[in-house]
Amino acid sequence: MNFREEAEKNEQWIIEQRRFFHQCPELSEKEVNTTKEIGKRLEEMGLEPHYYDGYTGLTADIKGGKAGAGTKTVALRADIDALPVEEHTGLEFCSRNDGVMHACGHDCHISMLLGGVKMLMDHRDKLKGNVRILFQPAEEVAMGAKYMIEHGALDGVDAIYGAHIWGGFEAPYLNFESGPRMASCDEFRIEVNGLSAHGSSPHAGVDAITTAIHIVSEAQEIVSRYNDPLNPLVVTFGTINGGQRFNIIPNKVVMTGTVRTLSSEMRKKTEEILRSIVEHVTAIHGATGSLEMKYLTSVVSNDHEDLNQIAEKAAVKLYGEGCLKHLEKMMGSEDFSFFMDEVPGIYGFLGSYDPEKGYTASNHNDCYTADEGLLKRGAAMYAQFAWDYLEEKAE
């Protein structure tokens, strides 16, 4: 089965879906109308959507006509939330919601997965297994995948496929390389407690600001001295707050930041070193301190060679040997990693950077959009991967 021609037949319908959802973006955990509209379309295809009480997002199951004993279930995922961005694309179908925009291409993901589902439903009688459809909310705040998992979205699933349209990757290439693809992202909060004093008498207090500055400085050595230089690691301080008046030494400083790495081992080690730095630097200065670490997303890593091969062969089947291209791993993060922590998964990219056609904005930019001719390519990949996976794994 080759879904290229099927995708071309459905191209206009897929584009219509993209334009509809682009005009009606909703923020993370508020995708109420988006969820409802996706559900309507799934029902029109003959599916029974499963919704979550008090939360957004939905799932549905395609039961294959040739499913038998030992049948596999493969999941296909698309994220559905938008960003708090005022759109400046100039599109005729631009956002109707002030200050909210599909600036990361999730409108494209919705339409591509709907297109993939439509094509699979047209051939359900020949499908050698089941397909779980996941329209995931709250990716931008790294909450949606975790919620869906906790409420059974992966129950009975043997593997999962996801992909992202990407402004930093040349159109119309695809990428399904093995190994780490996107970094883990963790948030930290450091509190330094000293002793307040008058600015004229620093010896009478314990300067929380000076202590905090030393912690920031020492933390940079985690990257330069404790980490293998061939392993990307970023330790970033995003906020530092302390003091209320120019002539008073404050007794407290609070700092927050993020740690990003492509190594699960270094992820754990960084927390240990940062905790040690806080403990020892505050002790040297006569202060006290604490570190709170909030684990957000794991490393997105394509570690299952069978899935990598199925995805790459599917791409070549659809668009020929030249459709795949190298893409450097990146330090951005994705909560698709939560799904990969639970079941074998593959995560790919579809390039949208095309300066000749004027598509140069990156994801999260207020001018980000993509050539709609790419949508059928993403839709075909959803359907082709599911079909080929079930064909290969059929017992």
What are the residue ranges of the model-derived segments?
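Histidine/acidic-residue-rich, glycine-tolerant segments that coordinate divalent metal ions
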Residues: 59, 83-85, 89-101, 108, ...
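Acidic/His- and Gly-rich active-site-bordering loop/insert found
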Residues: 1-102, 114, 118-127
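Divalent metal-coordination and catalytic microenvironments
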Residues: 21, 60, 76, 106, ...
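Non-cysteine beta-strand/loop elements that form the S-adenosyl-L-methionine
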Residues: 75-77, 84, 188-190, 347-352
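Active-site beta-loop-alpha junctions enriched in small/polar residues
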Residues: 26, 79-81, 138, 166, ...
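Metal-dependent amide/peptide-bond hydrolase catalytic core
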Residues: 213-395
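Alpha-helix C-terminal capping segments
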Residues: 117-123, 151, 286, 340-342
